[in-house]
Amino acid sequence: MNKEYTLLDLYEIYCEAMPRYPLAYERFRDILHKDNSQIFTAESSETIIGFVVVNGNSVVILCVKKEYRHSSYGKHLLIMAEGFISASYDEVVLGGGGLFQGVPCDEGEESSVPFFEKRGYNADFTSVNMGLTLNEKSVQKLKEIPRPDGVTYRFADDNDREKLLAAVKDAQADWLPIFEENKDAPVLLAVCGDEIAGFEMVEEYGGMFFSDNEKHGMIGCVGVTHKYRRRGIGLAMTAEGSLSLYERNCKDIQLLYVERVAWYNKLGYEVTSRQWMGRKKIQDIMF
């Protein structure tokens, strides 16, 4: 990055380009300072026009000022990112979860998806984010969700570690690394007798997109073991987790990478954004 420009300059470009995805400056700064992140910029003789952030094989953010769009600046930034990634990886991923899962493609806004499709990117699916504003109405709805008999809900402690990992392996083995690496993350359990029937991560400071000083919670990795499925345990557990965030004075709750949209609708959650999960093999890149 040209030393003439500051992170605040980049932040201002981001805020203009991504109004639907607000970030506090400190959060933006931390993303750009993440280990091994690389920043490339597009500049005119007078000002910075856009930038792209790369981490690993992911294009984390690509932003161009509105008045300079459709003028090849985005294309050249992407070429720089792809060239850097190609030195170490065989695939380029758009988003990658450092900030965005993929490419924002929300209704009512100009989509960047055609820009990436034109350059050989493909996506198998579109990821959905959801949210719930915590107020009297939404809390009442959560309280009305039926609670199955014989199930209690509590947060996990160190004594639950072995059983928790076994439950995760049974319900969704792909999540094991997440729970192993984040052993201090708060996890709400649904317990039947001496068995863990369900689990979910509940974080009062886990929200991603906000620019105020309020608390924004997040719920993730919601799972129920095979033995206890189809009893309403997952829905009740998520209602309990949501209420626990309300009790900790969270303003809202954010969900990322949602697949079961209709299921979360039952709890009052609504779709807030959609992201196109684009990627491209290095051999498809032309320099």
Where do the PLM segments sit?
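Acyl-donor-binding surface of acyltransferase catalytic domains
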Residues: I79-P148, G278-K280
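A short, internal acetyl-CoA/4′-phosphopantetheine-binding micro-motif in the GNAT/acyltransferase core
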Residues: S58-S71, G98, I219-R229, E259
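Conserved acetyl-CoA-binding loop-helix of GNAT-fold acetyltransferases
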Residues: H70-S86, C221-V224, R230-L243, E247, ...
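A structural microfeature
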Residues: G50, F125-V128, A197-G198, S273
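Short, high-confidence coil segments that cap the C-terminus of an alpha-helix
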Residues: S37, A87-D90, C250
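Conserved hydrophobic beta-strand within the GNAT/NAT acetyltransferase core sheet
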Residues: V59, V92-G96, V103, I219, ...
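Short amphipathic alpha-helix that is part of the acyltransferase structural core
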Residues: M1-R27, S127, Q140-D174
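A conserved beta-strand-loop-helix scaffold within acyl/acetyltransferase catalytic domains
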Residues: Y21-S44, I48-I61, K169-V224
